Each structure stands twice: as structure tokens, then as C-alpha cells.
UniProtKB/Swiss-Prot annotation:
The lineage of its organism: Bacteria, Pseudomonadati, Pseudomonadota, Gammaproteobacteria, Moraxellales. CDD domains: M20_DapE_proteobac. It comes from Acinetobacter baumannii (strain ATCC 17978 / DSM 105126 / CIP 53.77 / LMG 1025 / NCDC KC755 / 5377). NCBIfam families: dapE_proteo, PRK13009.1. Zn(2+) 2 binds at D101, E136, H350. Belongs to the peptidase M20A family. DapE subfamily. Its EC number is 3.5.1.18. The gene is dapE. Pathway: Amino-acid biosynthesis; L-lysine biosynthesis via DAP pathway; LL-2,6-diaminopimelate from (S)-tetrahydrodipicolinate (succinylase route): step 3/3. This is Succinyl-diaminopimelate desuccinylase. GO terms for molecular function: acetylornithine deacetylase activity; cobalt ion binding; succinyl-diaminopimelate desuccinylase activity; zinc ion binding. One of its GO terms (biological process) is lysine biosynthetic process via diaminopimelate. It catalyses: N-succinyl-(2S,6S)-2,6-diaminopimelate + H2O = (2S,6S)-2,6-diaminopimelate + succinate. SUPFAM superfamilies: Bacterial exopeptidase dimerisation domain (SSF55031), Zn-dependent exopeptidases (SSF53187). Pfam families: M20_dimer (PF07687), Peptidase_M20 (PF01546). The active site is at D70, E135.
Length: 378
């Protein structure tokens, strides 16, 4: 079987067991290719995380491909039909951990850049790559640290295309032009432990907190807008008790998350939660963790360039969406960059037997190359 450039590079990347935060030479493989076509290569290691900043050109505007080489753990190896780090093609599908999320997109970015530079050696502005091995993990020493470094030296990204698997039913049918914010909390409600037969001598934190939790679940936080659905509140964990059937627990711990729109701020959500908990007279502590601000890229140069490229290559009228979880776009958008996520189908990401359609790889490369043409061709 004749492998295209994108498929060949995908296979090479997929053979690397780069479980987060280990890069396992993926960035070196990419950097070697990029260096040959004139990119200045700058590895940036923070803690146990490898990052790559590669740039061709010194002027603006700057078009940046962003993505991650790390993958999630494989899960039970005996549940896979083939070794997750020995990629296989079966029935037109490429199987391997990271095939959809997101090593095939990384390969497409590199090949698209090689082809574009060959046609336009004196292109406008700059092309850059921002690649990390810490997207699937804590995301503390990855993209956010690279962005901080670039900001300190006043290096600005104009347009950023993140290669996350955005497509749903066919390649390019969905691109993400924003993401909701994510706010987490751990709530600890204090009670008084006692015997279930003597409730008057105890305080049951489950009973005391239940009305407040019910109100939090029923609250309408906002109604969303044309770009974002309404803010969502979800309880993810509840723990209380000793395991015994005759002991009233002394404390309750609840973990919850907001996925929130641009109609409300994290501070407003915190304030309303405290008001509800205080109204119910709870004795509590709460620890907040803001893991991502919401961002939105309105229709403009980058969105137009992507929609035009997708239509030309696939014939698909793409839909803009802000659904799904967080991505590293949340660290790039606050710098003022236009950010868009565009990649392969996401149906099997993080799953056993993760795979992608082989016939999508070359069209994805063509889309990426056309976006470069639309923005940086002289």
C-alpha cells in the first residue's frame, strides 16, 4: 500500500508511547521536518513537560498551528484489537492511541506547512507551531507556560488553528470557534457525627445540605446566547459516612462543575453559590478551581479562511460550535489571537480501539494548506 506523506508521518508519531506528560520524541520528529523547510526550532521544557515553539518568519501576522503530542492512557491492553502503539490499518481505518486525538492532525499540519512553503517560500508574515506534551494532564507546564514566555518577549499570535478532533459525522462538518468556561468546586459541609437512633444528638450534613444542593441543581444561571448554550451545573461526586448503617456522618463532601457561557463570570457564579449555601444556614468550606475562561472567535479572517477551505476541499458547509470540553485554546485566546479548532472525527477519542478514517487524512492536509493559502499567500 502506498502511504501518503500525512499517513506515513502519522504512523511514525503513533508508534511513540507518549502517554501524558511524556513526549517520547514526537516533537523531535516534527521539529526535524520543520527545520528542513526553514523553521527556527525552540524546545521549551518546563518541569516534566516538553514543549515546542517553531517559527518560520520574523514578521507579522503570525499563523500558528497548535496541538499536543501526549495521549491518554490506553486502558486495558487486552481490550484492544491491536497494540495501541503499533498502529494498524484495517478496513480503511487507522487504529492506535492518539489516532484521532490528535497525532494525525499534527502530521497534517507538518505536511501542509511543507507544501505551502515549497509553493510560497516568501510568504507573508510567519508560520508557527506551538506543541505540548501536557494537554491531557494537568496542563500546568504546557501551552500556558509557552504563551507566558511569548508574551514576555512581545511575540504575538494573530491566528491560531488547534488541531483538536472537532468533526462529528464527516470531516469539517463542525469547527469550534469558542469554548465554555470551566469552574470546579469542592464543597465540605460540617455536621455532627452520631447514632442514627439518636438524631437529636447529631447533625446530619446530608439532610442539611440536600435542600441547598437541590436549589443549585434547579437554578437557571443564564439563558446562553447565540454562540453558547445556557450555563450548566453538574454534581460529579458526593461522599459522606463511614460505611456503617448506624452512624450519622459528621461531614459531607461534594464536587461540582460549571460549564459556563459568556453571559456570566466565574465571580458571579461563586457569589450566587455562596448566597444559596448561606441562605440554607450551612456550616461549610468551599475550594474553587477555575480551569478555563470562556472564549469566542467571531466570524472574521480565520473563520472565513477555514470555512472557505473546508467547502473547497470537501464540499461541506461547516457549522460553528462552542460545545464540548476545554482545550488549550483557552490559554491562547486571552492574548487576543483568533482561535479555531479543526480536526478529524471525534467519535472514538479516549476510547479502546481509537481510530480515524484513513481517507480523511489527505483532505485534512489539503484544508490546512488552503487555510495557509487564504491567509499568508503573497
Amino acid at each position: 500500500m502506498n502511504h501518503s506523506d500525512t499517513l506515513s508521518l502519522s504512523l511514525e508519531l503513533l508508534q511513540q508511547p507518549s502517554v501524558t506528560p511524556i513526549d517520547h520524541t514526537c516533537q523531535t520528529i516534527m521539529a526535524d521536518r520543520l527545520a528542513k523547510v526553514g523553521f527556527h526550532i525552540e524546545p521549551m521544557r518546563f518541569g516534566d513537560v516538553d514543549n515546542l515553539w517553531a517559527r518560520r518568519g520574523t514578521e507579522g501576522p503570525v499563523f500558528c498551528f497548535a496541538g499536543h503530542t501526549d495521549v491518554v492512557p490506553t486502558g486495558r491492553l487486552d481490550a484492544w484489537n491491536s497494540d495501541p502503539f503499533a498502529p494498524e490499518i484495517r478496513d480503511g481505518k487507522l487504529y492506535g492511541r492518539g489516532s484521532a486525538d490528535m497525532k494525525t492532525a499534527l502530521a497534517a499540519m507538518v505536511v501542509a506547512s511543507e507544501r505551502f512553503v515549497a509553493k510560497h517560500p516568501n510568504h507573508k508574515g510567519s508560520i508557527a507551531f506551538l506543541i505540548t506534551s501536557d494537554e491531557e494532564g494537568p496542563a500546568v507546564n504546557g501551552t500556558v507556560k509557552v504563551i507566558e514566555t511569548l508574551e514576555k518577549r512581545n511575540e504575538k499570535i494573530t491566528w491560531c488553528l488547534v488541531g483538536e478532533p472537532s468533526s462529528t459525522h464527516k470531516l469539517g462538518d463542525i469547527v469550534k470557534n469558542g469554548r465554555r468556561g470551566s469552574l470546579n468546586a469542592v464543597l465540605k459541609v460540617q455536621g455532627k457525627q452520631g447514632h442514627v437512633a439518636y438524631p437529636h444528638l447529631a447533625r446530619n450534613p446530608i439532610h442539611e445540605a440536600s435542600p441547598a444542593l437541590a436549589e443549585l441543581c434547579q437554578t437557571v444561571w443564564d439563558n446562553g446566547n447565540e454562540y453558547f448554550p445556557a450555563t450548566s451545573f453538574q454534581i460529579s461526586n458526593i461522599h459522606a459516612g463511614t460505611g456503617a448503617t448506624n452512624v450519622i456522618p459528621g461531614a459531607l463532601e461534594v464536587t461540582f462543575n460549571f460549564r459556563y457561557s459568556t453571559e456570566v463570570t466565574a465571580e458571579q457564579l461563586k457569589q450566587r453559590v455562596h448566597e444559596i449555601l448561606d441562605k440554607h444556614g450551612l456550616q461549610y468550606e468551599i475550594v474553587w478551581n477555575l480551569s478555563g475562561l470562556p472564549f469566542l472567535t467571531p466570524v472574521g479572517e480565520l473563520v472565513n479562511a477555514a470555512q472557505t477551505a473546508i467547502l473547497n476541499v470537501t464540499g461541506t458547509e461547516t457549522e460553528l460550535s462552542t460545545s464540548g470540553g476545554t482545550s488549550d485554546g483557552r490559554f491562547i485566546a486571552p492574548t487576543g489571537a483568533q482561535v479555531l479548532e479543526l480536526g478529524v472525527l471525534n467519535a472514538t477519542i479516549h476510547q479502546i480501539n481509537e481510530h480515524v478514517d484513513v481517507h480523511d487524512l489527505d483532505p485534512l492536509t489539503d484544508i490546512y494548506e488552503q487555510i495557509l493559502e487564504n491567509l499568508l499567500a503573497q
